[in-house]
């Protein structure tokens, strides 16, 4: 299969040219539009006057002039959507979420669990490991355990009854239940045994510092021990202070990748712009989406607690504590572009950088020979019009 566009994101810049792909990308040829195809205005190839007809020697080239072709997005921090939740351990709910993500330009995702009891986490991990994506759904690339190894003071919306000290053996049991696919663990390094946990657990997966009271020195010790990522920068951690720099400054000094919830509510837009300038290519956009994403206002279960969705904001019921976002990652990309981030940078922060953060950038996250042929066609308003996963059409919305 071949595809032409005048705006294909190759590396960090949009270029014109032709992509060749089947399940994997094979080559990108920059330059002019192939002469054997005509633009019908609908993103289709027209040969011999009839869409889909192919004359002798005609190339199978899809014409996406006027569309942005970007890598499939990679959401490494998303709990739930459309009434379904990864923590429920239900395959039908995983199918629902998978389709929602694909419809919104996400081709790979890390089902993200909450701070639950070990038996519940095991069941969720088993379900995630056995999940097989539908043809019109995004692939799960492994588990993100957001807890239970977090601190009480910065637990946010995590259930305090299930918080557990960092335990490597427990992580190994959960990883076994997940079929060896735990990709990311959020933990608080200042808790009992935290640094020793980081040293051992980082051999299995990416360790992220989050839901933590860690000061600068403790955070740096954790980064030196093997941590390399930060969960939702600015949220559920101590704020930066000119004499108490804390985790945020440590993450910058250590060259860690850092998540940013991109709904414009968790972090004010001017601070988001500052974070982009500070972290650059180490910035990771995430949705941190909840069960009520895509659902009507009301109350919803969440990790053994209840959350309330009102006016586009989800909070722990009866409190002002933000529980997570109610947007897709693609909607987050649109918002940060509106806030002033260049489109190419926003897409990189939602594709190649998260793939690198979970050690999967050899396979997903960018348009490059040998990688999975996951890509999204966006119109000029950044709406998803087509999604390909493993080189096959998964979503089409061109009307």
Please provide the spans of the model-predicted regions.
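Metal-associated gating/positioning segment near the N- to mid-region
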Residues: 64-123
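Histidine-rich, glycine-flanked metal-binding segment
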Residues: 1-2, 7-70
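His/Asp/Glu-enriched, well-ordered alpha-helical/loop segment
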Residues: 249-258, 276-287, 293-378
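Active-site mouth loops of central-metabolism enzymes
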Residues: 80-91, 159-164, 206-210
